[in-house]
Amino acid sequence: MIRLIVFCLLFLGLNSCSSPLTKEITEYRKEYFKEFLSDPRSPLKEADLAKLDFFPAGEKERITASFQPTNDSEPFDMPTYSGLTRKYRKYGVATFSWGNKQATLSLYENLSLLNNPDFDDYLFLPFKDETNGVTTYGGGRYINMSKADAEDGTITIDFNKCYNPYCAYSDGFNCPIPPRENNLPFEVHAGERNFKGAYTAVGH
């Protein structure tokens, strides 16, 4: 398994003779590959990992945004692509510049995870951008973050770490649909691209 992961990273152009950012993203993607093999629900097998594709890591795709908590926001049902819903609550709003455009992204708490000590700090950032359906998955992408990332009125969002939901590889999953307020009016050439393998239709 480890040899395959190393091969995948080399194939993607990530190696130890690179910038600190590239090294960080290399380690991040190593863990990302491992999760596919350790998760019993995973839609991918070991041989599929070589078909994962990513944009090169870039400094400008890691942005510092102002952050405004949304205290006492009400829980709501976030729809998923399967037709079911999941309970979330808006935790705060990040505001940032991308080129000559201003943008906002909302971050959410998954209410089903709040009582889990392993995830009580977890924040969910789903978004869409203008690469969706072209070079990236049409249903949007996700970034995992933590409450500790939001300190002193700012938050760092690293689009190099955005990834596809399981629905990009197979049906049968309850993948949240990014809310309209998180539709970005520009292209984000960072993180995971379209899967190069075949989509698996397993039914529901």
Task: Tell what function each PLM region has.
Residues 19-75:
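Start-of-domain marker
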Residues 67, 107-111, 129-131, 159-163, ...:
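A mature extracytoplasmic/lumenal domain signature
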Residues 46-47, 74-90, 105-107, 154, ...:
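Extracellular/lumen-exposed scaffold segments
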Residues 1-8:
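Sec-dependent signal peptide recognition
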Residues 15-16:
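C-terminal motif of bacterial Sec signal peptides marking the signal peptidase cleavage site
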Residues 126-164:
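Acidic, glycine-rich flexible loop segments
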Residues 163-204:
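Extended, aromatic/histidine-rich regions of cofactor-dependent oxidoreductases associated
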Residues 79-139:
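Mid-length scaffold segments of soluble, non-membrane domains
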